[in-house]
UniProtKB/Swiss-Prot annotation:
UniProt source species: Rickettsia felis (strain ATCC VR-1525 / URRWXCal2) (Rickettsia azadi)
InterPro entries: Ribosomal_uL11, Ribosomal_uL11_bac-typ, Ribosomal_uL11_C, Ribosomal_uL11_C_sf, Ribosomal_uL11_CS, Ribosomal_uL11_N, Ribosomal_uL11_N_sf
Gene Ontology process terms (BP): translation
Keyword annotations from UniProtKB, A to Z: Methylation, Ribonucleoprotein, Ribosomal protein, RNA-binding, rRNA-binding
Protein name: Large ribosomal subunit protein uL11
Length: 145
């Protein structure tokens, strides 16, 4: 069986159950002659069990015959961190200038377990450090050991 020729890739962050032909999805798919309604229906169907509105990074592979496939990844670390810290927005200031909330090391470890498939490590301690770095970058203080 021969593989289809790949025309290109599209990276989008789409809310779960919220794929619509409106920007940014419609224009990105339309430029590559992909059937937008079909994509939206398939995406919304595959995310129907996920909490509505959760941002999902999605890699769409577009083939030469205008067909497509897509892979949905885990939500961004910042989404989980904000949820655990019970805040709606990260800090607009850099580093330690403005701490907007706190998360525990156990929270970071829990998030790392959820994010493991999308991180570039198989070691839970390294993954936890990655998540702690993300926490610092959005103005969260990591407490505990």
């Amino acid at each position: 069986m021969s593989q289809k020729a790949i025309k290109g890739y599209i990276n989008l962050i789409i809310p779960a159950g919220g794929a619509t032909p409106a920007p940014p999805i419609g224009p990105a798919l339309g430029q590559r002659k992909v059937n937008i309604k079909t994509f939206c229906d398939e995406f919304n169907n595959s995310t129907k069990d996920t909490e509505k509105g959760v941002p999902l990074p999605t890699l769409i592979t577009v083939y030469e015959d205008s067909s497509f496939s897509f892979k949905i990844k885990t939500p961004p670390a910042s989404y989980f961190l904000k949820k655990y810290a019970r805040i709606t927005k990260g800090s607009s200031a850099t580093k330690k200038e403005a701490v907007v909330g706190k998360v525990t090391m156990d929270d970071c470890r829990e998030i790392a377990k959820l994010k493991m498939p999308d991180l570039n490590t198989k070691d839970i301690e390294a993954a936890t450090k990655i998540i702690c770095g993300s926490a610092a970058s959005i103005g969260l203080e990591v407490v505990g050991n």
